[in-house]
């Protein structure tokens, strides 16, 4: 984080801006994936369509979480928020994109990484937890009540 000399406001660094941009593009691509599911995958099996739907829902939900984490990271210099963004982005790629590829192209070695993507998504939720402890220590119990 840097302080802008003219305004005295904190400005986000390149990594934070990149995380925000990635989250926005990821969210847009999740919407595209959902549109494809309802308009272009009619000839695929119900199992394939259900897999695609799960991937698209997970993609969108975690893109929103990644956007939230990246916006918080741009405001507060907690490195764990950046780690969370990285894990969520990697998780979306390894989980959702692998499922999309498996539906379109069939099973491959790369699709075996889907479980690793799921673990990255789970870790993306948990990594910021120590920030709560830090906030608790700094501000006492009142910080979490208000």
Please annotate each region the language model reported:
Residues 4-13, 36-57:
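Interfacial loop at the N-terminal end of multi-pass membrane proteins
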Residues 11-25, 80-88:
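Interfacial segments of alpha-helical transmembrane regions
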Residues 82-99, 114-128:
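Hydrophobic alpha-helical segments of small multi-pass membrane proteins
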Residues 48-53, 107-119:
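Non-cytosolic membrane-interface motifs at loop->transmembrane helix junctions
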Residues 97-113, 131-133:
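Membrane-helix boundary connector in multi-pass membrane proteins
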Residues 2-7, 137-146:
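Short, charged juxtamembrane terminal tails flanking transmembrane helices
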Residues 25-36, 50-75, 79, 88-93:
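Core segments of alpha-helical transmembrane spans in multipass integral membrane proteins
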Residues 61-69, 121-131:
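Hydrophobic cores of alpha-helical transmembrane segments in multi-pass inner/ER membrane proteins
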């Amino acid at each position: 984080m840097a302080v802008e000399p003219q305004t005295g406001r904190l400005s986000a660094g390149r990594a934070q801006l990149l995380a925000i941009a990635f989250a926005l593009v990821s969210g847009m691509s999740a919407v595209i994936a959902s549109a494809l599911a309802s308009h272009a995958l009619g000839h695929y099996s119900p199992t394939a369509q259900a897999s695609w739907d799960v991937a698209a829902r997970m993609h969108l939900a975690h893109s929103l979480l990644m956007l939230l984490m990246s916006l918080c990271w741009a405001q507060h210099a907690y490195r764990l928020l950046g780690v969370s963004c990285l894990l969520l982005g990697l998780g979306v790629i390894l989980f959702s994109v692998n499922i999309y590829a498996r539906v379109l192209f069939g099973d491959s070695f790369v699709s075996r990484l889907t479980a690793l993507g799921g673990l990255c998504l789970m870790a993306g939720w948990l990594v910021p937890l120590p920030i709560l402890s830090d906030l608790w220590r700094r501000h006492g119990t009142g910080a979490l009540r208000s």
